Amino acid sequence: MYAKLSRLIATIMLLVSVSAQATPVIQQWQAPSGAQVYFVENHDLPMLDAAVAFPAGSGFDTADKSGLAGLTLGLLSQGAEGMNEDDISRRLADVGAQMGGNFDADRAGVSIRTLSSKAEREEALTVMARMLQRPLFPEAVLAREKTRLIAALKEAETRPESIAGKAFSKAVFGSHPYGFQGSGEIDTVEKLQRSDLDNFYTAHYGAKTAVVALMGDISRAEAEEIAQRLTGELPPGGASDQIAAVSKLSSASTLRIAHPATQSHILLGAPGVSRADADYFSLYVGNYILGGGGFVSRLMQEVREKRGLAYSVYSYFIPMQQPGAFQIGLQTRKDQADEAFKLVHKTLQDFVEKGVSEKELTAAKQNILNGFPLRIDSNKKILEYLAVIGFYHLPLTYLDDFQTKISKVTVADVNAAFKRKINPDVLATVIVGSPEEKAQLAKTAGDSK
């Protein structure tokens, strides 16, 4: 009886902490251009944060043009109608505006932070609108950026963490675009032409698939004008905004790659969860217990605290439009790589088979909810949430839902979700810096799927 009462009290306290945390009010509408707009009005600071994102990430590359999506985004700020790259930098600097970007397998976008005062805001938005809607993709700049990118790709081929990441993506996703490197391959980047960038931009940077996020010191009427201004002259688009379905792994695989580094870099995982998956919140809490909670996680306790096999070990899910990777990673001395790998695998196997305890669950939920205010404590962080909510068609109540749904996750929810999504016997494993006598060149899981 006392155990049930304790659980009830813990649940009530979680719900109280949830209800006490205020979340921003999100306004949403469709601009005349067809773009979806998400806006939070906040006059605490004389600032405006604006972002425009498109379904134009590396997941929309093709194998023969890997790297195209990233180069297209990168060159938006390198020249637009009436402005070269120096003009863009100077005009933004003159009004104290900061330009940024967002790029992953699903999304590509541009963001800006500016003072909300009329003169500064107008100049910053003029530059941003021109970049988005009148890019030039100058030949000379493209040649220079390709040279820089190829040099970076060659350098990455020497670093064990880069080698491991690339091999892991291929092992988990095979020929699926999620297995491509966002920066591309040396041979594909070398062949990219200006016409490729222009065609990709025209197909993927359309107004009807654009998501505009606005946060800060402006009114609703001003937000409506800004959203239309940033998207009203975008190309028609027309390319699909859907990524191809991801296949589950059909068998386990292990790839050992020799490297002179003193430590082995170990990655293991599989396709995990999409943004829209009903198991998302259960997996989120469960992963906090497994390897996402730092020193309180099981992996850290078993691998570092009890045995000293690694300084750090982690696990995470990457929720995407299609299931992104579930990944466990660590570094350890070469002579203990096999021991560390076996321990990590056994810890995961026990986690999936035996599940989590009520004590672990309560602590994890409390830590997640206590940390929630830090997730929305700046305009920039809220802006990114607006972009995610819009891009993945999440409800406007997502920030409230996040807290409520986390608080309601049960032991049974976590255990069932992990059993559905993670099979410890069917994982892709990559060990870079494996002991030389064990290193081998092998096919990736993607080649045998």
Where are these regions (language model features)?
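Bacterial N-terminal signal peptides that target proteins for export
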Residues: 1-9
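Bacterial N-terminal signal peptides
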Residues: 8-19
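Boundary at the C-terminal end of the N-terminal hydrophobic targeting segment
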Residues: 20-24
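Short acidic-hydrophobic surface loop/beta-edge motif
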Residues: 27-32, 255-259
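M16 family metallopeptidases and their MPP-like homologs
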Residues: 40, 45-71, 85-131, 146, ...
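A common structural junction motif
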Residues: 129-137, 230-238, 346-355, 446-449
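An aromatic/glycine/proline-enriched structural segment found at the starts
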Residues: 182, 187, 207, 211-274, ...
